[in-house]
């Protein structure tokens, strides 16, 4: 098993997509640092490259914002390439001049090397400075025709080490009376199912308790809904992954988030966990109990 520290330096033309790139690495579980001064990289790597360090993947953005320090980058890249105690890759992001000018016009920002606001002059100068560094890069991606989503997918394709690190599913339950979860991608309302709240011996239990789970699932409409739901979910999950989505949140809601939604979140997560990296949570499961305790 390779226990070496994995280091990726992200560099390239200003406006070529380094922000999207570093976010992509963060989604893959990398420790990320934006705008890292090149003269600090050696010391930073030394701090991480120790037996008791728990960080095993690092992605650093180094670009022309470092200005005076940038001249150190080539020698540092050479040192990291020759360092047998780390796994090192250099990622260079590029785009054609027309596209870069267009992106700067769209964002209304100034190129770091532009003189008197002349963006194209700044791009030309930067391209000359980075020419040797581009030649040293193990991975070069031209983003001229790529959307942010396409770029993210390309990076995942080239750098991801496992399916678990590139796509995961969050299944959650919630109560509509406490509001919709803001981060949910898919929301399913299960308030049409019989409510255990009206069964006295089930009222103070929740959907993780076997009695409540069985009560919810024993009704024919529960089984019909579950079967139809899985027929929909199974084919669309690979499509979400293919589009480069890192987290898909599937939420089930009932009135208070204690019984029906919890039971369904448990059942669906158990089925999907066989194939997908998945986490299940119950936002409002204990909210009623907490309210009673505070009163």
UniProtKB/Swiss-Prot annotation:
Q: What domain of life does the UniProt record list for this protein's source?
A: Bacteria
Stored Gene3D superfamilies: P-loop containing nucleotide triphosphate hydrolases
Annotated positions binding GTP:
63-66
Q: Does the keyword ATP-binding apply?
A: yes
Q: Which GO terms describe its molecular function?
A: ATP binding; GTP binding
Residues that bind ATP: 12-19
Could you tell me the keywords of this UniProt record?
ATP-binding, GTP-binding, Nucleotide-binding
Which Pfam families does UniProt cross-reference here?
Answer: PapZ_C (PF22740), RapZ-like_N (PF03668)
**InterPro entries attached here?**
P-loop_NTPase, RapZ-like, RapZ-like_N, RapZ_C
Q: What does this protein do?
A: Displays ATPase and GTPase activities.
Family to which the UniProt record says this protein belongs = Belongs to the RapZ-like family.
Q: Which HAMAP family match?
A: RapZ_like (MF_00636)
Q: What is this protein called?
A: Nucleotide-binding protein LACR_1047
Q: Which organism is it from?
A: Lactococcus lactis subsp. cremoris (strain SK11)
